[in-house]
Amino acid sequence: MAIADGKVSLKHLVTMETLTNEEVLGMIRRGGDFKNGRADFQLDRQYFAANLFFENSTRTHKSFEVAEKKLGLDVIEFDAGTSSVNKGETLYDTILTMSALGVDICVVRHSEVDYYKQLIDSRTIQTSIVNGGDGSGQHPSQCLLDLMTIYEEFGTFGNLKICIAGDITHSRVAKSNMRILKRLGAQIYFAGPTEWYSSEFDVYGQHVAIDDVIEDLNVLMLLRVQHERHRNDKGFSKEEYHTLYGLTEERYAKLADQAIIMHPAPVNRDVEIADSLVEAPKARIVTQMQNGVFVRMAIIEAILNGKA
C-alpha cells in the first residue's frame, strides 16, 4: 500500500489495521471529492467486479454495486443461492474461479471470521479482495463511511468523544471503528449490556452507562442488536433493551446541540433507537448510506490504482 501524488494505492482491503492514518484520511477525503463532483476519474481499460455475498445485505451490497457502476466497471452477477457453492464448492474455489475468469475485484461477505486470509495468501488468485464483512470480525468499508460522516461534521477526530453503544461483541462495525478511532485520537466509550462486552476492548475505551456520558458526547454510534447471533441467549425484550440501553426521546433531549447520531443499519426501530428519531435533526443515518457509495468509489479507485 502507498500514496503517490495524493492517491491511495491498495492490493486488497480486508481490515482497517492494514491502513495507515494517511491512507484512511486520503480515502475519506477522496470520498468527499466524489460526493462533491471534484473527482477526475477515468478507467484505463475494461475492469470487472463481482460482489459475492454469502450473508444477507442491502446497503453494503447495493452501494458497492452503485459505486462500481458509477466508476464504469462491468459488474458480474453472482447469486450464492444458485452458485456451485450449493454443490459443495468452497469459497476458495469460487474466488479462484473468478480470478481465472479475469475478475479484477471481488467484494466478499462471509460468515467465517478471517475468511480472506487464504485468499490473499494464495499464489494463484490474482483478483483483489475487498472485505464486505467477515462474520463478527471486521467491516472496513462501513468503518470508512462512518469516518467520512464524522469528518464531514467535525473536520477532525482528535479529542472527539464517541460512544459505541449496543451489541459490541458481535459487531464487526464496532471492532473496525474502535481500532481506528482510537488511533486517530478520539476518546472512546462503550455502552450496552455487559453480557455483550469483552474486556479485550478495554484497550480502546471505557465501558460506561450511557446516561453518564450522553450529555458530553460528540457522536453516539448505535449498533444493531444482532438477533441472529443470539439464538441461544436469554436476551432482552425489545422494550427492555430500548428502556435500558436505547436512544429514547428522553436521552435524545440530553444530547449536545452539535452532537450526531449514527447507526450502520438496518435499524431495529424502537429497540436501538426510537422510531421517531431515525430521521431526527441530529441523525446522520441517511447521510451514512449516501456516503457509503462515495467512500466505496474511493476504495475501488484505490484498488485500481494498485493495478496500474
From Swiss-Prot:
Top EC category: transferase
Species annotation: Streptococcus thermophilus (strain ATCC BAA-250 / LMG 18311)
Keyword Magnesium assigned: no
Binding, carbamoyl phosphate: R59, T60, R109, H139, Q142, A265, P266
SUPFAM superfamilies reported for this sequence: Aspartate/ornithine carbamoyltransferase
Keyword Transferase attributed: yes
Cross-referenced HAMAP family: Asp_carb_tr (MF_00001)
Record function comment: Catalyzes the condensation of carbamoyl phosphate and aspartate to form carbamoyl aspartate and inorganic phosphate, the committed step in the de novo pyrimidine nucleotide biosynthesis pathway.
PANTHER family: ASPARTATE CARBAMOYLTRANSFERASE, ORNITHINE CARBAMOYLTRANSFERASE, MITOCHONDRIAL
Protein name: Aspartate carbamoyltransferase catalytic subunit
Entry-linked NCBIfam families: asp_carb_tr, PRK00856.1
GO molecular function: amino acid binding; aspartate carbamoyltransferase activity
Subunit note: Heterododecamer (2C3:3R2) of six catalytic PyrB chains organized as two trimers (C3), and six regulatory PyrI chains organized as three dimers (R2).
Annotated pathway: Pyrimidine metabolism; UMP biosynthesis via de novo pathway; (S)-dihydroorotate from bicarbonate: step 2/3
Residue sites binding L-aspartate per the record: K87, R172, R224
Gene Ontology, cellular component aspect: cytosol
UniProt KW keywords: Pyrimidine biosynthesis, Transferase
InterPro entries (UniProt xref): Asp/Orn_carbamoyltranf_P-bd, Asp/Orn_carbamoylTrfase, Asp/Orn_carbamoylTrfase_sf, Asp_carbamoyltransf, Asp_carbamoyltransf_Asp/Orn-bd
Similarity comment: Belongs to the aspartate/ornithine carbamoyltransferase superfamily. ATCase family.
EC number: 2.1.3.2
